[in-house]
UniProtKB/Swiss-Prot annotation:
Its EC number is 3.-.-.-. The gene is ydjP. This is AB hydrolase superfamily protein YdjP. One of its GO terms (molecular function) is hydrolase activity. SUPFAM superfamilies: alpha/beta-Hydrolases. The keyword Lipid metabolism does not apply. Signal peptide: none annotated. It comes from Bacillus subtilis (strain 168). Keywords: Hydrolase. Induction: Expressed under the control of the sigma-W factor SigW. The keyword Hydrolase applies. Belongs to the AB hydrolase superfamily. The active site is at 94, 217, 246. InterPro entries: AB_hydrolase_1, AB_hydrolase_fold, AB_hydrolase_sf.
Length: 271
């Protein structure tokens, strides 16, 4: 199994598929790079598709330190440097979008040529005057308590809410298996950190072309959250998926892959 070892000796699992301009897929909280498996066979014909499991997730080391969005972004920086990747497209789903934004805030876009944001608002928390956050304080406490005391029903409900239509039992089983690879101590730590993250004030700093992909079934986010991003990110394109909730790349993979290819072809053609 391919791993890269970070400076703090944490091993991150990754896979590469295809060659060409690199697309680094960054998964959401509790998840893994395996959630992007429906992209690799199509996109790898023209691009180098990379799945990376963030620290504490999937097949990566379950270290008990470093579980913040800012550290995950630094891990991405170290990964890109070690792999000698340039002109990278960062594709972040859910919490992965926070990692993309934090990366650009910390390091700029010297080796990044585009960003793909998949179903994520600028903050998950319901700050005063902010209507696009799925968590209030009571909801966050409930989620963290469930992870520590009775995680299985919470995770099963979480998976169901990620889809507009209930996924097949076999689909639910492999997704649940991926989530359960993560110890509860890590799950609750990163859930708290990512829920408190707030990128509303830095969206205007994103100075690479950005594709915004949102499901129209608003179990997690409404398309209005995507419209807010489009209004605040200088060079952003919003595409919505009518049969999707939180996972258009799994729920409507053909439409998602086609949309991503069209966006990338336009960006690469202009670079």
């Amino acid at each position: 199994m391919p791993y890269i070892i970070l400076e703090d000796q944490t091993r991150l699992y990754y896979e590469t598929h295809g060659s060409g301009t690199p697309i680094l897929f960054i998964h959401g909280v509790l998840m893994s790079g395996q959630f992007f498996h429906k992209q690799f066979s199509v996109l790898s014909a023209n691009y180098q598709c990379i799945r990376l499991d963030l620290r504490g997730h999937g097949e990566s080391d379950k270290v008990l330190h470093g579980h913040t969005i800012s550290q995950y972004a630094r891990d991405i920086r170290e990964f890109l440097n070690a792999m000698e990747l340039d002109h990278v497209v960062l594709a972040g789903w859910s919490m992965g979008a926070f990692v993309v934004w934090d990366y650009l805030n910390q390091f700029g876009n010297d080796n990044i040529q585009a960003a793909v944001i998949i179903d994520q608002s600028a903050s998950d928390y319901q700050w005063e005057g902010w209507e696009h956050g799925p968590f209030d304080f009571d909801g966050l406490k409930t989620a963290m308590h469930a992870i520590q005391t009775d995680p299985l029903p919470f995770y099963e409900s979480f998976i169901q809410n990620m889809f507009a239509e209930p996924p097949a039992e076999t689909e639910t089983e492999w997704m649940l298996a991926e989530i359960l690879k993560q110890p509860a101590a890590i799950s609750s730590t990163i859930l708290f950190n990512q829920t408190a993250a707030d990128y509303r004030g830095t969206l205007q700093n994103i100075n690479v072309p950005a594709l915004l992909c949102f499901g129209e079934d608003k179990k997690f986010f409404s398309t209005a959250a995507g419209e807010h991003l489009r209004s605040n990110i200088p060079n952003a394109t919003l595409v919505t998926f009518p049969k999707s909730s939180h996972c258009p790349f799994l729920e409507e993979p053909d439409a998602f892959n086609s949309t991503l290819l069209s966006f990338l072809d336009g960006v690469i053609g202009k670079s």
